Amino acid sequence: MPETTTAPTPPDAAVEHLDVLIVGAGLSGVGAAHHLQTACPWASYAIFESRAAIGGTWDLFRYPGVRSDSDMHTLGYGFRPWTGAKTIADGASIRSYIVDTAAEEGIDRHIRFHHRIVSAAWSTPDARWTVTAERTDTGETVVVTCGFLLSCAGYYRYDRGYLPDFADMDRFTG
């Protein structure tokens, strides 16, 4: 995200400050939270998840036959090795692995569901991020500041598919 000096911390005392804000409660977000709370147990953090569940891709995609295309000994967590029967695991098993890991590590208590990031602006004078999120369940705007912002949001747009831009797209009829 571009650096700016035009977004100082809002003066409102009600703005929560976190040491770290993690975006996304999927495989990467849960893994990042584990490493953060292990290496920096003093750090305050939250995970903002736009959806209503832990698991990211593995929660969203539940079609028949969905599975990993990487072996779980590589894809899984080094701190909680995969013990499932299948090395190339099905989506439901991977989702359970992520959910169980979050619960066992106490990470689930840090997740704020229905929080979709709208903007993030770095303030050089304040040396912190100001992050604005929208509650997808209530429409409420939430503003927090943080020293570190970790994007673990994956690469899928859950709200719409990818639409490429190509010449004469408006004339394409199918």
List each model region and its residues:
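Feature captures the FAD/FMN-dependent oxidoreductase FAD-binding
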Residues: A85-Y158
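Glycine-rich active-site loop/strand segments that organize a redox cofactor
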Residues: A52-D100
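N-terminal Rossmann-like FAD-binding beta1-loop-alpha1 element of flavoenzymes
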Residues: V15-I47
